[in-house]
Regions:
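P-loop NTPase catalytic core of nucleic-acid-dependent motor ATPases
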Residues: 29-54, 95-208
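Intein modules and their embedded homing endonuclease domains
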Residues: 1-119
Length: 208
């Protein structure tokens, strides 16, 4: 439905879109930062920028009826320029979780800030002991090795290699070692990389 001139948004004059004004108002409604060409909200990296394109389309479809694809592409590029941010700081004193921020001193806040990685799991101080997980570990590892694994998994939640340690799980096939990797994947998501030891053996530049 066509708008009357009185109903036109501030960023449209009847023929052209004022990109600067459009982007300013869009970012007020949808706060974002553009870091190294990728868009972030406080909830983390926007994996599918098509979502942003769809939001732009909703804004402009009331005043434009043709050339929408090109306009959306141009406005998305302009939004990235206006939302530019230098690289986000690496923070080793906190873990960004789905429902807020957990600090290494044991405190927690529901406040969120822009971060490189936000876990998709929520912090719950009253969560019950993971009995099934602990039972699995007791069947897989020696009792004294369980705290070591737990410590290493906790270490992986922080963006640091200060410990200069590597963990190797050695055993026969089919024992359940790979299930630990699945648990790590559910916690870390795309922040975790997997590969085979054969690639590391044959290519010293392979990701470990």
């Amino acid at each position: 439905m066509d708008m009357t001139p009185q109903a036109w948004p501030d960023w449209y004059d009847g023929r052209h879109i004022n990109e600067v004004l459009f982007c300013q108002q869009f970012l007020e409604k949808h706060p974002m930062k553009c870091v190294r060409g990728r868009l972030f909200t406080v909830d983390g990296l926007i994996e599918d920028e098509g979502q942003i394109g769809n939001l732009i389309l909703e804004e402009i479809s009331g005043v434009l009826t043709s050339g929408l694809s090109k306009v959306v592409t141009n406005l998305l590029a302009s939004i990235k320029l206006q939302a530019y941010s230098p690289p986000l700081p690496i923070e080793t004193d906190r873990i960004h979780v789905a429902n807020g921020t957990y600090f290494m001193d044991g405190s927690f806040t529901a406040d969120k800030s822009y971060c490189n990685n936000r876990l998709t799991v929520a912090y719950n101080p009253n969560a019950p002991a993971p009995k099934k997980w602990l039972q699995f570990l007791s069947e897989l590892l020696q009792p004294e090795d369980i705290p070591t694994l737990q410590e290493f998994l906790g270490y992986c939640l922080l963006p640091t290699t200060k410990g200069q340690k590597m963990l190797m799980l050695i055993g026969k096939g089919g024992e359940g070692k790979s299930r630990i990797g699945l648990v790590m994947r559910s916690l870390l998501g795309d922040s975790m990389n997997t590969t085979s030891i054969q690639k590391v053996e044959s290519n010293r530049f392979s990701r470990a």
